[in-house]
Amino acid sequence: LNQKTHDFLATLAPLALSGIGEGVAAIVGSDLEAAVERLLPALPPAARLVIVDQTADGAQACRRFVQTDLRLGVINETPAQFIEDMVEQRFDALLVMPGCEGDEQALVSLLWQGGFMALHPDLKAPSVDPDELLSWDTGRGVALRMLPPKPRRRGGRRRNQPRQAAA
């Protein structure tokens, strides 16, 4: 692992995983075995992690984790195939690693509201609507947070406002 990857896996990636409770996270990229090994201690006990490795060797190497940890699953697909397959699925956290070049923008669509995406510093940050996503560059990668929808005002009398006297 290079220094950038090391820093990302020590800071932003575990932060993305730590808050998901019983949710589902995905790590997407190539040759992910070393990264997954570093991140497993940060995965909450009731959470699940989908490992999406587009290299056959990387996916095979990650399968050894699945034998001992039932929270994990491995998919051997490219990021584009994964996005297509996951049309109905949303994730609480996405860890986007090298191997996803060109798919960064499309992966945003897989986040739940409130979901957290951690983007490796070698990748291009997606352009986002600030009303829908918070985005900040930490220097060790980019963090994206999907915002909940704005509350809609419903009709009816506003509380704390005096009624107009009936004429």
Locations of regions flagged by a protein language model:
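Conserved alpha-helix/loop element of class I SAM-dependent methyltransferases that forms part
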Residues: 2-24, 34-38
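Short glycine-centered segments of the SAM/dcSAM-binding site in methyltransferase folds
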Residues: 24, 48, 114-117
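Core SAM-dependent methyltransferase catalytic element
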Residues: 131-167
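A short acidic, Gly/Pro-enriched loop at the edge of an enzyme's catalytic core
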Residues: 83-94
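A short glycine-rich, Lys/Arg-flanked "PGG" loop and its adjoining helix->strand segment in the class I
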Residues: 103-116
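Class I SAM-dependent methyltransferase SAM/SAH-binding core
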Residues: 36-73, 80
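A short SAM/SAH-binding and catalytic strip from SAM-dependent methyltransferases
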Residues: 92-104
